[in-house]
Amino acid sequence: MIEEEPNLVNSGKSQRVVVNGYPFSIEIYRLETDKTWTLEVVDHEGTSHVWDEQFRSDKDARNTALQALEAEGAVAFMRADNIIPFRKP
C-alpha cells in the first residue's frame, strides 16, 4: 500500500511586507501531521531564508519574522554572505 504524503498547511499569518522599500514575503507553514510551524522569509529576488527553529504557533513565527526584519533591516536579508548555497551534484 502506498502511503500518502501529508498535506502542507499554509498559515493565515503569512503575509507580504515592505521594509526599506523592498518587498518580502513571510511564509509560515507546517505539515498537517506536525504541531510546530516553519518560518521562511523570501526577498524580492526570490532568495529564501528559513529559520532552523520551529515555532509553537504561527503567531510566534510571524512576530519573529517582523522583529528580525525591523531589527536587521532589508539589506541584512539581501546580503549574499549570509546564504548557504545548495550543493551541486
Regions found by a protein language model. Name each.
Residues 1-4, 47-89:
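Mixed-charge, Lys/Arg-enriched low-complexity segments
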